């Protein structure tokens, strides 16, 4: 949250991995209506911001968000930030495996230290599910990069700001269930060797300067050994139920080139044709109350085939919507909710490019 004056406050809602369930989306829709939110922004860290709020609205939203499973604490300042994930993890064709469940566990763990650990500066953690590396996990304070065999390479002390640095590879072939040991090791390395005196040099990447690359790697690995000795098996992630089943089934499931006997390119073309047939006077309608797009409200000339993305689950698709500058017309939240509310397992994912 930041304020430049009375009535000029914004509230950032964490969405770990950019995942917005229908329940969370409904909360956003209701809050927009209840507090007359005029401006909303989806961010490069995969969160949702409400702008131009008064003090009462900010406090009310903070409290009510908890009931919807949304945490607002630590959205800014020297805290662990929203955990980033490849936006279509779990449904993306060609991904190595679904990293989202492990990222959500990491995010929950980091939220647990907010009240007890004082970091030198903010800490950004990212997970990548494929070589596309949409989250730039190799350039984060801590990044987990998926590998084809179902493990992670771990990068640390990277950053894309001033004096940008690629992260130091501190571990290879890490089992997904062990990621919390690496998260805790990062926290301890940062609090031990990070700069509390100069904010200009307080980000993790400056530890590469003070310790040297090899020195930093050694320092991190020493903390990792310390964490493993202290916690033993207690930090192992144990996924349960449907989440565990999906994670296992998704590993190595890269082939979805043929959907129910039809080439995905042909399927995309057919869907595009179907949408085109429903266009009347440049308006696409889903029901009598909801208008998805008009030429005036969404001026980009983008082919529908570029926005319809075949999932690796046969016969299912994702639809991309990219608001200019990440500024979403506030009514769009309600329109999207009305479209997906009755679709089983449908949800919204926010991408690092503000799609």
Model-derived features: positions:
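Long hydrophobic segments that form regular secondary structure
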Residues: 279-296, 300-317, 324-347
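Short acidic (Asp/Glu) and glycine-rich catalytic loops that position anionic groups and cofactors
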Residues: 7, 83-85, 160-167, 195-202, ...
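Single conserved hydrophobic/aromatic residue that forms the stacking wall/gate
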Residues: 1-6, 10
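Terminal amphipathic helices with adjacent charged low-complexity linkers/tails
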Residues: 52, 56-57, 64-68, 191-262, ...
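Short, flexible, solvent-exposed loop/turn segments with mixed acidic/basic and small polar residues
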Residues: 4, 37-42, 192-197, 308-313, ...
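Hydrophobic/aromatic-lined pockets within catalytic cores
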Residues: 111-115, 187, 191-195, 225-228, ...
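Small-residue-enriched alpha-helical segments and adjacent helix-cap loops
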Residues: 11-152, 181, 250-258, 262-269, ...
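Mobile "lid/hinge" segments at catalytic clefts and subdomain interfaces of large enzymes
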Residues: 119-213, 217
């Amino acid at each position: 949250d930041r304020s430049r004056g009375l009535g000029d406050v914004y509230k950032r809602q964490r969405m770990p991995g950019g995942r917005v369930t229908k329940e969370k989306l409904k909360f956003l829709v209701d809050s927009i209506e209840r507090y007359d939110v005029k401006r909303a922004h989806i961010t490069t860290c995969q969160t949702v911001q409400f702008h131009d709020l008064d003090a009462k609205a900010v406090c009310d939203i903070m409290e009510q968000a908890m009931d919807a499973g949304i945490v607002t604490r630590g959205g800014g300042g020297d805290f662990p930030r929203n955990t980033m994930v490849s936006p279509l993890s779990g449904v993306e064709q060609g991904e190595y495996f679904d990293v989202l469940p492990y990222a959500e566990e990491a995010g929950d763990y980091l939220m647990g230290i907010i009240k007890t650990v004082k970091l030198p500066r903010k800490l950004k953690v990212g997970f990548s599910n494929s070589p596309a590396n949409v989250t730039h996990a190799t350039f984060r304070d801590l990044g987990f990069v998926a590998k084809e065999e179902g493990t992670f390479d771990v990068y640390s002390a990277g950053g894309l700001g001033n004096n940008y640095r690629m992260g130091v590879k501190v571990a290879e072939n890490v089992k997904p269930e062990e990621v919390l040991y690496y998260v805790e090791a990062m926290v301890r390395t940062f609090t031990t060797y990070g700069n509390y005196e100069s904010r200009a040099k307080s980000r993790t990447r400056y530890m590469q300067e003070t310790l040297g690359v090899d020195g930093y790697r050694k320092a991190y690995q020493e903390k990792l050994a310390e964490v493993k000795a202290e916690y033993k098996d207690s930090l192992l992630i144990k996924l349960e139920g449907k989440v565990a089943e999906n994670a296992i089934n998704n590993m190595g499931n890269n082939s979805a080139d043929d959907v129910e006997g039809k080439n995905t390119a042909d399927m995309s073309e057919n869907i595009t044709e179907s949408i085109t047939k429903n266009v009347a006077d440049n308006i696409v309608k889903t029901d009598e109350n909801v208008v998805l797009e008009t030429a005036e409200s969404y001026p980009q000339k983008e082919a529908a085939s570029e926005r319809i993305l075949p999932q690796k689950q046969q016969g299912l698709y994702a639809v991309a919507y990219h608001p200019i500058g990440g500024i979403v017309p506030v009514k769009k939240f309600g329109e999207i909710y009305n479209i997906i509310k009755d679709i089983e397992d449908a949800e919204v994912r926010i991408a690092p490019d503000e799609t």
